Regions:
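Start-of-domain marker
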Residues: 1-64
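Functionally constrained cores in energy, signaling, and assembly domains
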Residues: 13, 19, 88, 293, ...
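Extracellular/lumenal and peripheral-membrane lipid-interaction modules
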Residues: 20-22, 273, 350-356
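Glycine-rich loops and low-complexity Gly/Arg-rich segments
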Residues: 27-29, 40, 308-310, 330-333, ...
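Mature, soluble, non-transmembrane domains
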Residues: 44-339
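Juxtamembrane interface at the cytosolic side of transmembrane helices
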Residues: 340-360
Length: 360
């Protein structure tokens, strides 16, 4: 993703999306596809060759697509050679962020943005911020049930650095510990998702030992027991045994087997954590003037680049912040003019004073 911020507050956003024959030759983007980005009305589509900054309007002719396909040969796809770009202009950063094309779990990512101008006479500072709302509520079992907040932040976002000054062997040992905790959290949520399906069919449970609300309230305790097992070896029979023991009843056993889920529910379960691990992109930001604070991003050749992934706003909001400075040339001109005028006035005043003094 490329974001260009202008001095007047307007901005442009460009994202790169995967293109196939249909998109390239018709210009119609399939928003029903499981992709991070969704293109609504108002976006202009372009295509360009990989490694080339040239842009060409979409749609391209079918003949052009076939020509490119022949050029790349049978062993490669056109999408490996041709990129598709979607571009949109905005009047303000606020409008741009409110219209974010990025989606997490079928919901538009919550993004608040702003551009503040701080006037300093000889220069003006531009402060760009973009804040992503936390997705913690998406997961029924919080990660802090299995890891400390610091551990989770380091594992999913890379900060804070918990290994400063530690030897490599210790680093490896701690990472293994974190991985085990993170895996247990993942499987705890999957188990919760699976078992909460029983609540959706609670009217079909024969002689339930507790009410539906009480069943849901105890699910986190149940999945914590299940999380103590090796996820790769946990079988449905074990899950049934744990639940029967916890509730003192076999009433839920018929709902815990491989055939109980519909195809849609099975696909939803498969995608449940896919959203967390597949939501990933780099955002490059071009600011007016010279960047004086990259805010943790990587600054190179006038561009600040941040990696945006769901892990960074798993626990709390994630903010991007870049500060740039524009020199107000006119301020130097005005200051120089005022200084010259003042100098002339002082000299002229002295000459007038000397003239009248000489006449006395």
């Amino acid at each position: 993703m490329l974001t260009i911020v202008n001095e007047d507050g307007s901005c442009m956003r460009e994202i790169r999306v995967e293109g196939d024959r249909s998109l390239l030759t018709t210009g119609k983007y399939d928003n029903d596809d499981q992709r991070v980005a969704r293109i609504e009305d108002g976006w202009e589509l372009y295509w360009g060759y990989k490694g080339d900054n040239s842009r060409f309007h979409i749609p391209m002719s079918a003949e052009k697509f076939d020509s490119i396909s022949r050029e790349v040969g049978p062993s490669r796809a056109v999408k490996d050679t041709v990129y598709v770009y979607a571009r949109k202009e905005y009047a303000s950063v606020e409008d741009m962020c409110a219209g974010s094309p990025m989606f997490f779990a079928d919901d538009q990512t919550g993004v608040d943005g702003s551009l503040e101008k701080e006037f300093r006479w000889f220069y003006t500072d531009y402060v760009f911020t973009e804040k992503f709302s936390s997705v913690a509520d998406y997961f029924s079992v919080p990660v802090t049930d299995y890891m400390s907040e610091e551990e989770a932040s380091y594992w999913f976002a890379g900060t804070p650095d918990l290994y400063a000054g530690k030897p490599i062997w210790r680093y490896y040992e701690l990472l293994e510990d974190f991985k085990e905790k993170a895996d247990r959290w993942v499987f705890a949520n999957l188990h919760y998702k699976l078992l909460s399906g029983i609540a959706d069919r609670y009217d079909m449970v024969v002689e339930p030992p507790v009410s539906k609300d009480e069943f849901v309230a105890q699910l986190r305790d149940v999945v914590k027991q299940l999380a103590s097992y090796d996820p790769s070896k946990l079988e449905y029979a074990t899950v049934r045994s744990v639940i029967s023991s916890h509730f003192g009843s076999d009433a839920y056993s018929p709902f815990i087997n491989e055939d109980v889920l519909s195809d849609e529910e099975d696909e939803e379960l498969d995608n449940y954590f896919g959203y967390l691990f597949l939501f990933y992109y780099d955002e490059s930001i071009v600011m007016p003037g010279r960047v004086i604070d990259a805010g943790g991003g990587i600054y190179k050749d006038g561009v600040v680049t941040f990696t945006v992934d769901a892990g960074r706003f798993l626990l709390k909001d994630y903010e991007i912040r870049v500060v740039s400075r524009v020199v107000n040339v006119w301020a130097f001109v005005v200051t120089a003019a005022l200084a010259s005028a003042l100098f002339v006035a002082v000299v002229y005043r002295k000459r007038i004073a000397a003239y009248f003094k000489g006449r006395h």
